[in-house]
Swiss-Prot record:
Baeyer-Villiger oxidase; part of the ergochrome gene cluster responsible for the typical purple-black color of the ergot sclerotia. The ergochrome gene cluster produces several ergot pigments including the yellow ergochrome secalonic acid and its derivatives, as well as the red anthraquinones endocrocin and clavorubin. The pathway begins with the synthesis of atrochrysone thioester by the polyketide synthase (PKS) CPUR_05437. The atrochrysone carboxyl ACP thioesterase CPUR_05436 then breaks the thioester bond and releases the atrochrysone carboxylic acid from CPUR_05437. Pathway: Pigment biosynthesis. It is an enzyme of class 1 (oxidoreductase). It comes from Claviceps purpurea (strain 20.1) (Ergot fungus). This is Baeyer-Villiger oxidase CPUR_05427. Its cofactor is NADPH. The lineage of its organism: Eukaryota, Fungi, Dikarya, Ascomycota, Pezizomycotina. The keyword Transmembrane helix does not apply.
Length: 454
């Protein structure tokens, strides 16, 4: 994993290579951009906490820089990506050397999970483990060894609206052990909304279910969740930021698991590829088409995360050093969590016409190249650029299936991908961070309190 400067990427050193600059390979990345990205990613790695606040405060700097780079950003664009995320960051927490020395004991690690103040200690431990055993062996031990600890760690990868698994996917995609170490430390330190219980409940429900003659599509499963009064009414507006933990999982965990468990992938590489593409397609369709009649178009903040994280399951699917069954399990968990997030946001009405009829004066006529060039200039924390890149990946992933025998599982097809990308830029350009997206779009209150969307 040597970079353009010949320096090896290590668990503590960022060193990007021309050989690993993103899954799409659809733009030229210049050497100067790589060099400044290396410098700024290293600075972020050494100086800034993974959490700018303890609750729902993820450091997006590496996401923004790597996405900007993969979209062909100039050195100035890379610097902008860093600067836009800088003001809110806080310094690394203190290193607890005594804890680091004990984290090799799985019981100590297990009992320490959820300690955000120990992020730096987790990071130091995972870096040390990688230096001794290699980064792939470390990932295998802590995510795929099927121990009590690794099961909890794998579930925690999906916490915080998918942020740790996004981070992990970036580490895989750009072949950066230091980013992978950050992802493992982020998952270990993250607060817990009880996703582990939900994922295990889904697997238990799947094991006892009578096999369906024909597998349900992910979109059908989401519709089934919406049609259940118990599930649909589980999240309350008054749950605020805890609609997943206290709402869906607190009031209807088993019921939601029963419905979501119907997303099952046969144990073949072909099925993994197709159903990963279906998951990506469905998430993009739901995010772009969940709109409010009579209001300006605005994408939901959490549905957006369903899309931005989806790209990394294409990346994970290509990691043949991970056992096939574990890669399949990760995609099953992703799709089942997508069902829960669909419910968290109020089971929004899905209106295809809201997407197919979309136009705006900013993005009309833009192709992918023009969208890339525009979005890397946007003042943003990486969400908009990540979504556009994920949509392009979705177009490529879904293309082999959208006109074949499984076409009903792929509601987004043809030029709808480009329309969705135009909507992503057109509805966010020029907006401040608080108005780029709408939160919990299926509820009335977000729309009633947004005069800008009248």
């Amino acid at each position: 994993m040597a970079s353009t400067t010949g320096t090896e990427a290590t668990p503590s050193r960022i060193s990007l290579s021309q050989d690993h600059l993103g899954i799409l390979h659809d733009v030229k990345v210049n050497t100067a951009s790589i060099e400044i990205a290396n410098s700024l990613l290293q600075k972020n790695h050494e100086e800034w906490h993974m959490f700018f606040r303890d609750r729902a405060g993820h450091n997006h700097i590496s996401h923004s820089i790597l996405t900007c780079l993969a979209l062909g950003g100039s050195p100035e664009d890379i610097q902008r990506a860093y600067d836009d995320g800088l003001e809110i960051q806080r310094p690394m927490p203190p290193l607890d050397d005594a804890l680091v020395a004990r984290l090799g004991d799985d019981n100590v690690m297990y009992e320490s999970l959820g300690s955000i103040s120990q992020y730096r200690s987790f990071l130091a431990y995972f870096q040390h483990h990688m230096e001794e055993h290699g980064w792939k062996a470390t990932v295998t031990k802590y995510l795929f060894s099927h121990t009590k600890l690794s099961e909890k760690m794998l579930a925690r990868m999906y916490e915080g609206a998918y942020h740790p698994v996004i981070h992990l996917g970036l580490g895989f995609e750009f072949q950066q052990p230091a980013i992978v170490a950050e992802a493992l430390a982020q998952a270990a330190a993250h607060d817990d909304s009880n996703l582990y219980t939900y994922f295990i409940a889904c697997e238990e429900e799947s094991e006892i279910a009578y096999p369906l003659q024909q597998a349900k599509t992910l979109l059908q499963i989401m519709a089934d969740a919406s049609s259940s009064k118990t599930i649909r009414n589980a999240p309350h507006w008054e749950d605020y930021g805890n609609k997943m933990r206290d709402g869906v999982l607190g009031r209807a965990c088993r019921e939601t698991a029963n419905v979501a468990s119907k997303f099952v992938i046969r144990k073949t590489p072909e099925s993994l590829r197709r159903r990963t593409a279906e998951m990506i397609d469905t998430c993009a369709y739901v995010a772009a088409s969940s709109q409010r009649s009579g209001r300006k178009r605005k994408i939901d903040f959490f549905y957006m995360h369903m899309v931005t994280s989806s790209l990394f399951f294409s990346v994970i699917g290509e990691q043949d050093w991970i056992p096939l069954n574990d890669r399949i399990r990760m995609v099953e968990w992703k799709a089942r969590l997508d069902v829960a997030w669909y419910v968290v946001c109020g089971c929004a009405d899905i209106q295809q016409l809201a997407l197919t009829a979309y136009n705006d004066p900013v993005t009309d006529g833009m192709g992918w190249e023009e969208l890339y060039a525009a979005v890397v200039k946007e003042h943003d924390d990486g969400h908009v650029s990540k979504m556009i890149r994920a949509l392009k990946n979705g177009q490529e992933a879904a293309r082999p299936f959208e006109n074949g025998p499984y076409r009903n599982a792929f509601p987004l097809h043809g030029d709808m991908w480009l329309k969705a990308a135009r909507m992503t830029l057109g509805t966010t350009t020029g907006c401040d961070e608080d108005t780029k997206f709408v939160m919990f779009t299926g509820f009335d209150i977000p729309w009633e309190t947004r005069p800008d969307l009248q």
